[in-house]
């Protein structure tokens, strides 16, 4: 029996299933309750809802972005921006580093959240979210985007966020969008680990046991691929990962790769959609089999000793309720 709990939070619904209830989260250890519960509810929940209306479920609105919180300024976070250029692939990454202003008051190592699709993520980080984080053991924020004024660099993310062909191990045409390349996740991960992360750690001390990676859609594939890679990150948030992409290539990898049992690794799988006023799903491409795929992943991770949980997040017009399947 799967129990799904829907909790109303300003018309957003956060769901934990597979026997994990919201009350359980509220009673987790001090580490989870004070840091990652806040991150989940304030950033990951809102970005999942945002993501559900974007690239995987509906065509993203590719309009130039207004000034973000780093440009406007925040009372709670200081932001730095740095560009990283890869000459071999002619790409320039724009990375925003958000450091809580409490850093000036303490020498503690900080939890950190590395977010993909950084341009879009930064456009939806608001002062009220940063205030809430600041008041609850604020994490360092690292938004990894591209040199563009649009929310997404679709061709670049298609290459960077997806795993290589399982037979050749090389990039190839994206089977979903043949005009783009795919399969460059290993190279992109090296940029993060060898260039971006060291720059972050030169600016602020990070806690190695509290380094989170968040990605949506293709970014969710990158998160899962990074879990299989096993380096650097301790917490993995895969929001609406495109598990059906390329004949379920990521599912095939997960089924075959043997993970080393690491109790310090934690995985959250997240799915979501938006409902219209009439109660119908906004997404025309909603994967009805997505929950079953996530269940299979959870089962595999559980067998290999990786702590994993599943969240279902939906925006709708209804009262709090519990659904059982």
Please place each PLM-identified region on the residue numbering.
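Alpha/beta-hydrolase fold nucleophile elbow
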Residues: 205-216
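Serine-hydrolase catalytic machinery in alpha/beta-hydrolase-like enzymes
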Residues: 108-191, 195, 199
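Gly/Ala-rich beta-loop-alpha elbow adjacent to hydrolase catalytic centers
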Residues: 215-219, 223
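Conserved hydrolase catalytic core segment
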Residues: 225-234
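A domain-start/cap signature at the N-terminus of enzymes
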Residues: 56-111
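The feature captures the conserved acid-bearing segment of alpha/beta-hydrolase catalytic domains
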Residues: 244-314
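Active-site nucleophile loop of the alpha/beta-hydrolase fold
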Residues: 146, 237-245, 274
């Amino acid at each position: 029996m799967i129990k799904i709990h829907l909790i109303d939070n300003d018309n957003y619904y956060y769901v934990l299933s597979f026997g994990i209830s919201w009350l359980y989260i509220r009673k987790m250890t001090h580490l989870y309750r004070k840091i990652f519960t806040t991150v989940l509810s304030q950033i990951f929940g809102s970005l999942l809802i945002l993501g559900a209306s974007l690239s995987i479920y509906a065509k993203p609105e590719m309009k130039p972005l207004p000034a973000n919180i780093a440009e406007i300024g925040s009372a709670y976070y200081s932001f730095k921006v740095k560009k990283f250029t890869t000459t071999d692939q002619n790409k320039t990454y724009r990375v925003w580093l958000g450091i809580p202003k409490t850093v000036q008051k303490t020498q503690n190592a900080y939890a950190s959240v590395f977010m993909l699709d950084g341009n879009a993520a930064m456009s939806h980080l608001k002062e009220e979210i940063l205030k809430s984080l600041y008041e609850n053991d604020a994490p360092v924020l690292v938004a990894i985007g591209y040199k563009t004024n649009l929310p997404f660099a679709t061709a670049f993310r298609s290459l960077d966020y997806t795993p290589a062909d399982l037979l050749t191990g090389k990039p190839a045409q994206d089977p979903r969008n043949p005009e783009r390349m795919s399969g460059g996740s290993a190279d992109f991960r090296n940029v993060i680990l060898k260039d971006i992360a060291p720059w972050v750690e030169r600016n602020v001390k990070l806690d190695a046991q509290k380094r989170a990676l968040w990605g949506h859609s293709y970014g969710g594939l990158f998160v899962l691929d990074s879990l299989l890679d096993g380096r650097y990150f301790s917490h993995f948030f895969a929001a609406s990962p495109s598990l059906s992409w390329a004949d379920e290539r990521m599912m095939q990898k997960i089924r075959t790769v043997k993970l080393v049992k690491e109790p310090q690794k934690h995985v959250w799988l997240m799915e979501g959609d938006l409902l219209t006023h009439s109660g119908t799903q906004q997404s025309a491409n909603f994967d009805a089999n997505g929950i079953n795929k996530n269940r299979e992943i959870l089962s595999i991770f559980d067998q290999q000793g990786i702590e994993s949980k599943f969240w279902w997040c939906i925006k709708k017009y209804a009262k709090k309720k519990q659904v059982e399947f």
